């Protein structure tokens, strides 16, 4: 014990010339540990235990805080100021979070703008609908009546009709265009676009032979009535030619004997013109 007591006069703190950090760092960082370890030095006897304890307490406080070569993460634990700096950094980063949290606000502002745009578009559509002219019954009747008479109007006629029914020439023009299109579409749906074939032409043929006997009592008036019904013009020249045909038929029938024929038109070969 005597040897150890003589050696304890030279403590590790005196040899290394280390400053006493119990008041500076130990009070801040190792305060609870000193309170918990405070009763232990009282149990130990002699200055050796006290000096060794001081040396052990002083060494761990310096090595992890300032020796950054072994552990690069110790720079964050260098001092309480660093921790405060990190906290300040977090506090400084808080406003951007607030700004990011406030970032959806423009979207909320944009939605009313979009609504306004949609409302504006709806307003335009409403204006376009309002621009549509509703014709009265009198105006429609007059337009349809004029359309049946004349499907295309010139500029003066259009202006005159517009002044009569209290419309603008442009409105009259558009109405005529739309009505022509409607009529054309209606005809196309009903199949009226196909032009009908012309009716066959009817030709009036005088009856010269009836029941195997020539008809001598055929008069010009009967022929005129027949041709009038058929739509063929009748003239005096055609009546004279008919009389000439009757005369030739009588002469030929008197000169030649009557033979029974299979068809009454065979006698037409004996006629002379």
Swiss-Prot record:
GO biological process, one term: type B pancreatic cell differentiation
Pfam families: Homeodomain
Tissues in which the UniProt entry reports expression: Expressed in restricted areas of the developing CNS: the hindbrain and forebrain, and pancreas.
Record GO cellular component, one term: nucleus
Keyword flag Transcription regulation: yes
Free-text domain note: The homeodomain is essential for interaction with OLIG2.
Protein name stated in the entry: Homeobox protein Nkx-2.2
Organism: Mus musculus
This protein's encoding gene: Nkx2-2
